[in-house]
């Protein structure tokens, strides 16, 4: 009878996003507090060191910073000099791009329609061949066997 569960408040798992954000904040605060206490301890001992990174992490961060610098510094040897384009030139280029993309879309639509049409004609032809009957009403076996052979050939390919 004393086994009743006590009221604990809001279930932390009802809103998972809120729970996760609280958990992340809690871990960040905990790490910051640990770091602060660590530096206080170092200061008391008289050692003034900057926080050291692992060799791998520092090498990666250096590589990233060098790549960032290289990518954002314009290199006059690799790039031709760009003169500012006026409005008419930019409009012309934009129009050409739009026309090119429109042509590509039209071509893909036409190709798709052609393939659909070919497949439907092929289906219709097969249907006609398979529905042929003898004089006595029995189905013709030749087209059916050919159909099965074609299916087997497709599976092999």
From Swiss-Prot:
Listed GO CC annotations: nucleolus
Statement: the UniProt record of this protein carries the keyword Nucleus: yes
Keywords for this protein: Coiled coil, Nucleus, rRNA processing
Membrane spanning stretches: none
Top-level taxonomic group: Eukaryota
Subcellular location: Nucleus, Nucleolus
Disordered: annotated segments: 1-23, 44-157
Stretches assigned to coiled coil: 106-135
Pfam families per the UniProt record, alphabetical: rRNA_processing
Biased segments, Basic and acidic residues type: 13-23, 63-75, 89-131
UniProt xrefs under InterPro entries: Fyv7/TAP26 (IPR013730), Fyv7_fungi (IPR017265)
Family classification: Belongs to the FYV7 family.
Protein name: rRNA-processing protein FYV7
Gene: FYV7
């Amino acid at each position: 009878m004393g086994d009743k569960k006590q009221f604990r408040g809001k279930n932390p798992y009802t809103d998972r996003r809120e729970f996760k954000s609280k958990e992340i904040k809690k871990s960040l605060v905990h790490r910051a507090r640990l770091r602060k206490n660590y530096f206080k301890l170092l200061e008391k001992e008289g050692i003034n060191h900057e926080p050291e990174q692992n060799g791998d992490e520092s090498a990666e961060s250096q590589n990233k910073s060098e790549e960032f610098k290289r990518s954002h510094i314009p290199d006059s040897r690799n790039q031709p000099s760009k003169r500012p384009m006026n409005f008419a030139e930019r409009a012309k280029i934009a129009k050409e791009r739009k026309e090119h993309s429109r042509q590509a879309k039209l071509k893909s639509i036409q190709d798709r329609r052609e393939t659909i049409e070919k497949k439907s004609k092929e289906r219709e032809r097969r249907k006609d061949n398979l529905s042929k009957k003898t004089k006595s009403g029995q189905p013709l076996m030749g087209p059916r066997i050919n159909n099965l052979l074609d299916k087997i050939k497709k599976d092999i390919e």
